[in-house]
Amino acid sequence: MQKQQTLKDKFCLQGKGLHTGLDIHITFCPAPEESGYKIKRVDLEGQPVIDAIADNVHSTRRGTVLKKGEVSVSTIEHAMAALYALGVDNCLIEVDAPEFPILDGSAEPYVSEIKRVGLVEQETPRDYYIIKKRMEVSDPESNSKLILLPDDEFTVDVHIAFPSKVLSNQFASLETLSDFEEQIAGARTFVFVREVQMLLEANLIKGGDLDNALVIYDEPLAQDRLDALSDMMGVERKQVNELGYINNKPLIYDNEPARHKLLDVLGDLALIGKYIRGRIIATCPGHSINNKMARLIRKEIKQNEAQAPVYNPNKEPIMDINRIKELLPHRYPFLLVDKIIEVGPDYIVGVKSVSGNEPFFPGHFPGEPVMPGVLQVEAMAQVGGLLVLNTLTEPSSYSTYFLMIDKVKFRRKVVPGDTLVFKLRMISEIRRGVANMRGLAFVGEQLACEAEFMAQIIQNKE
């Protein structure tokens, strides 16, 4: 199972702010596991910290703005996309201004530095949220829509459309995060010339220029008007004779604007706080609709904090009943696990089909058969025993004895016809032959039972 990661070392970048025009210093630092992304405003008294999560997004006009109390920080999306795509789970970001520097308008400078310092694996497993149902958010006014579908991986498709002679319809896609560096990271932010005056009058894009954004000239303007806009931006005047892109650097990709919109989608969804497995289809996305989806996913995560494993009954098991009997001493009527469907270095998923013929149902209870809670815990413990034995080179030589069962909770009745799916995960590394695990038992998507276990591993067989 993939572990959480943080930076091996800190790195620093310097550049001007897109909207403030300030000279900004930003430092990315390693952070403890389970801390996520945190942003520290080192220029303010007390150096307040803002959690980079979707719930803290205050504004989405021309960028994503986080706010906590009176403290805010903006233009974070390019950095967030780079951290997320390159597999950084935990990072403390120190910045001395109310926004991140725009740099070259893409995520490439962040990617380059992350690659340079490298990553270090941490102890805690990365917790993915698996999308199991269609989710959709939309905005009829802007024709924006984000659809999230179940998928084994994380993929993104983006379609953008503008009423423009230069930029009308474009598509971009990302089939795996490992392609981000090559296919998406270098795509720069963009703006239409016709929007520039309005943005300047709104006290925005003070740091914008022809090096850190694609400037799209799609409606003819008199040269004196173009000169006036150049003067307002503080950039060199430029003679423009035809519609198109007016930049100091050529397009990196033919569909660079669409790729940048995909970059923004990643950056805004990084604020979910977890990696997800699902397919995103984004139509005319923007920071507002991206944040709407991120908030919806966070709400789903909170409502389903303990998420059931994916169970496909047609899939060949990792361990069938015969292999289980080779490892566990239990036999009928006390062998309470039918198969193992998934196993990793520190977790396991097992299945128990609860039949109406179980020997305990006639007495528990007549007329209302309910699986005893203690037997649910026993079944979970047997799956946990298989997890422990799976870590050993010669598992058939060992037995597992449970020393303690703690924090047991029963959430719903288990009745004939139910299928119990157990997921157990190591809480810590096995030390001196003692293993600590947390177990969850599900019926469908519902949590039925949970408990924590301590077990002793003993070599007692030839």
Swiss-Prot record:
Active-site feature positions: H287 (proton donor), H364
Cellular localization per UniProt: Cytoplasm
Main location: cytoplasm
Sequence positions that bind Zn(2+): H78, H260, D264
Cofactor requirement: Zn(2+)
Molecular-function annotations in GO: (3R)-hydroxyacyl-[acyl-carrier-protein] dehydratase activity; metal ion binding; UDP-3-O-acyl-N-acetylglucosamine deacetylase activity
Listed HAMAP family: FabZ, LpxC
Family recorded in the similarity comment: In the N-terminal section; belongs to the LpxC family.
Purpose of the protein: Catalyzes the hydrolysis of UDP-3-O-myristoyl-N-acetylglucosamine to form UDP-3-O-myristoylglucosamine and acetate, the committed step in lipid A biosynthesis.
Protein's recorded name: Bifunctional enzyme LpxC/FabZ
